[in-house]
Amino acid sequence: MAASTDVAGLEESFRKFAIHGDPKASGHEMNGKNWAKLCKDCKVADGKAVTGTDVDIVFSKVKAKSARVINYEEFKKALEELAPKRFKGKSKEEAFDAICQLVAGKEPANVGVTKAKTGGAVERLTDTSKYTGSHKERFDESGKGKGIAGRQDILDDSGYVSAYKNAGTYDAKVKK
C-alpha cells in the first residue's frame, strides 16, 4: 500500500477537488463532475488506457445506489478499480501506489480562465473613459458602474414643473 505521506497527500487532493466549484461543499464528499476533473487533471484518465467513460463507469460502481456523491473511502476504492487499467503489467498494489502518486498533492487546475483583452479593436469597447453619448453617464471617472442611477432618469414626482427653480418655497411665502 501507499506510504503514510502519500495517504495524507491523497486525502488533501480529495478535499481540494471535492470543494472545487462549489462554495457550499464541506470537502467530505465528491460529485461525479469533480471526480472526472480529478482524473483528467492528475492524468489518471489519459484518453487511451483510461477514458472519460471509464472514469464515469467506475464512479457509478463505487457510489451507493441512490447517492450522487462519493466519500473518501469510496474514492480510494475507485482509484483501486482504475489502477490496473491505467498501469497494465503491474500488480494491483504497484498500480495502486502509482495511481496514488499521480493524485497525491495535486489541486484543480483552472484551465480556460481568461483575462480581459486590452489593445487592438477591443480597447475602445472595454475602456469606459472612451464611451460616448448616454453610455458615458453610466460610469464614474474611475470606470466603476453607477448602477440604476446611470441607467435610468429618476423622475421627480413632487408636482412641480421640471424647470421650476423655487420648489418647496410656497409655504414660506404664505406664512409671511
Swiss-Prot record:
What is a biological process (GO) this protein takes part in? microtubule bundle formation
| Function statement | Regulator of microtubule dynamic that has microtubule bundling activity. Required for embryo implantation; possibly by regulating beta-catenin. Also required for decidualization via regulation of beta-catenin.
Q: Does the keyword Endoplasmic reticulum apply?
A: no
MF (Gene Ontology): tubulin binding
Its recorded name reads Tubulin polymerization-promoting protein family member 3
N-acetylalanine sites (modified residues): 2
An example Gene Ontology cellular component term from the record? Answer: microtubule bundle
What InterPro entries does the record point to? EF-hand-dom_pair, TPP/p25
Q: Which family does it belong to?
A: Belongs to the TPPP family.
Q: Where in the cell is it found?
A: Cytoplasm; Cytoplasm, Cytoskeleton
> Keywords in UniProt for this one?
Acetylation, Cytoplasm, Cytoskeleton, Microtubule
What main location does UniProt list? cytoplasm
UniProt keyword Cytoplasm, yes or no: yes
Taxonomy of origin reads:
Eukaryota, Metazoa, Chordata, Craniata, Vertebrata
Gene3D superfamilies recorded: EF-hand
